[in-house]
């Protein structure tokens, strides 16, 4: 959960297990996209990145998109999603990131920032992939192939 931008998940615990957040006494399944008229706004982090990928699927159309990245560089990812809840936009943005939360001072205080020394550089790659006939993602291979979950 992004403390500075809690949105409509404001009643949820700071930390929760994907995909369910408990908000004001009821469970919110974050895999489900609410209608725009519900005016929902989410901003939260995935902090246990192991294999270096994140993905979104449209289960109705079978279209999936995902990002493959180096988990040593991008140790977490975040999802900002507004379904009419911010400026009436209907969009989801999934992105790997090097640290969290959004506020740098809080990130640094928690020891979650990446630091480059003067003159130091960092080079990495991020692979964006789109694939049809996928309703749930098991993984993303290094060549960008999105693997359908078995379940």
Predicted regions and their residues:
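Active-site/ligand-binding surface loops and adjacent short beta/alpha elements
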Residues: 1-69
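Active-site pocket scaffolds in enzymes
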Residues: 59-151
């Amino acid at each position: 959960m992004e403390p500075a931008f809690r949105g409509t998940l404001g009643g949820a615990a700071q930390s929760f297990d994907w995909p369910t957040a408990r908000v004001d006494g009821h469970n919110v399944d974050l895999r489900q996209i609410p209608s725009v008229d519900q005016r929902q706004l989410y901003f939260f982090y995935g902090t246990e990145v192991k294999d270096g990928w994140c993905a979104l699927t449209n289960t109705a159309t079978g279209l999936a998109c995902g990002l493959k990245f180096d988990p040593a560089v991008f140790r977490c990812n975040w999802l900002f999603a507004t379904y009419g809840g911010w400026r009436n936009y209907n969009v989801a943005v999934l992105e790997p990131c090097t640290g969290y939360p959004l506020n740098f001072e809080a990130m640094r205080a928690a020891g979650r920032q990446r630091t480059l020394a003067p003159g130091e550089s960092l080079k990495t790659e991020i692979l964006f992939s789109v694939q049809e006939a996928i309703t749930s993602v098991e993984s993303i291979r290094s060549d960008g192939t999105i693997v359908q979950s078995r379940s």
